[in-house]
Structure formats: structure tokens, C-alpha cells
Amino acid sequence: MLKTRVIPCLDVKDGRVVKGVQFLALRDAGDPVEAAKAYDAAGADELCFLDITASHEARGILLDVVQRTAEACFMPLTVGGGVRSVEDIRALLLAGADKVSINTAAVNNPDFVAEAAEKFGNQCIVVAIDAKRVSGPGEAPRWEIFTHGGRRATGLDAITFARTVTARGAGELLVTSMDRDGMRSGYDLGLTRAIADAVSVPVIASGGVGGLDDLVAGVAEGHASAVLAASIFHFGEATVAQAKAHMAAAGLAMRLDP
């Protein structure tokens, strides 16, 4: 049975972590490599870096961060944000990323997913789906894809889009509820479950974790294969080990460190 993965997420801007990370062992909370080393030591199954830098000039800084992290850490590393071309993907993989997350470029051109999967293999192509609930009270639930940090509506149905990019070769989907992100009220389980049940690839639940029970629900009720969280780990409210122990106690298959 496949183990459920716990994935901390670091937002990186101009080579620095944006959300504070309150690890006591960290000399510099703003350094993503130090944060990554701490999560690696804490037993995270994977780590996700999302580069939210607007400028293309900062790509060199991100590549340096990825390279230094890959040299220092054993856990798999997924990197996303601003990936627009096959060259971007190649550069990140060469720097040491294990997987690359594509967002806006996949929305603009789903065939880009096929091209990337053909060149680098399905296993390292993740499509990030940012969605908002657009159905009203009493209506059948419906979610729309948004880009540009949730600011730009696309008119695309999230479930249909998930099927499209999976058919094009995406090996994994990172599903974030824009409604729940940062709200600490739990994942949008309806969204996560609808997508997970519609595709044959692993789905990572993202957006809205406020406590450890939310992680359990993401898998047990949301049918996710992995759970991503930021704030509860960054602000020291729970450790990765506590999260895994809590999920294992709820009957989920976890990779527990001895």
C-alpha cells in the first residue's frame, strides 16, 4: 500500500522564504536552504518550493537555492512558480529538483504538459490547479480554475481541466483551494475529492490546513495521496513527526521514522 506523503511548502521570493519559519534551530529563518534542511531532518516526505518572484531575472537566484538544497537534503524536491518553457524545466531538474510544478503555462497551453512529459517523463511533471468554488447555494458544486495567484478567472472547469492535463501526461496534481488558502479552516474536501476521483494520478491536497485533523480529512475524505501544509509547520504549531503520528493513529499508511 502506498504511504501518504506529508509535504511542507515554502514560498520563496527573491531567494528568501516569505512566510516566516519559526524553527528554533534556524539561524536565519529567511533562508530557504536552512528551512529545507530542518524539514529534511524532521522527516518530511517531500518539500515543495513555490517561487512567487515576479521578475524573470530572479530565476538564477532560485536555481541557486534549488542546487544548494539538493546538495544538502535527501528528500525529493518539487519546484514551481513561473515555469513557462521546456528550458525552465530542464534548468530546474539539472539544478536538482525531482519534480517541476506547472501552473499558468498548463492553463494557457495544455499541450505544453504533453511536451514536458514526453521530454522528461510523467513522474516529474506536476500540474498545479488553483481553483475557486463558483457554484451558489443549492447548486451542484462547481469549481473554476484561476491563475495569477487567484486574481485571474479562466472560465475553465477544474474537474475537466484536471482530466485534460492528466490525459496530456501530468504525473501528479497539486490542488489548491483559493477559497481556503490561508483561512485555516481545512481543505476544500469536495474539490479535492472530485478531482482525485476523476483522475488516475496522485493528488496533493493544498490550501487551508488549520490543524492535524485537517491532514487526516484530506486523505480519508478528500481521497488525496499527499497533504501539503505551510503555516502549521512554519509557525511551530506542529512538527512533521507529530503530523505523521496523528495520521497513522487515524489509520492512514505513513512512513514513520524509527
UniProtKB/Swiss-Prot annotation:
A GO cellular-component term linked to this record: cytoplasm
Documented EC number(s): 4.3.2.10
Predominant place of localization: cytoplasm
Pfam families named among the record's database cross-references: His_biosynth
Oligomeric form and interacting partners: Heterodimer of HisH and HisF.
Molecular function GO labels: imidazoleglycerol-phosphate synthase activity; lyase activity
HAMAP family in UniProt: HisF
Protein name, per record: Imidazole glycerol phosphate synthase subunit HisF
Species in which this protein is naturally found: Methylobacterium sp. (strain 4-46)
Reactions catalysed: 5-[(5-phospho-1-deoxy-D-ribulos-1-ylimino)methylamino]-1-(5-phospho-beta-D-ribosyl)imidazole-4-carboxamide + L-glutamine = D-erythro-1-(imidazol-4-yl)glycerol 3-phosphate + 5-amino-1-(5-phospho-beta-D-ribosyl)imidazole-4-carboxamide + L-glutamate + H(+)
Record-stated family: Belongs to the HisA/HisF family.
Compartments where located: Cytoplasm
Coiled coil ranges: none
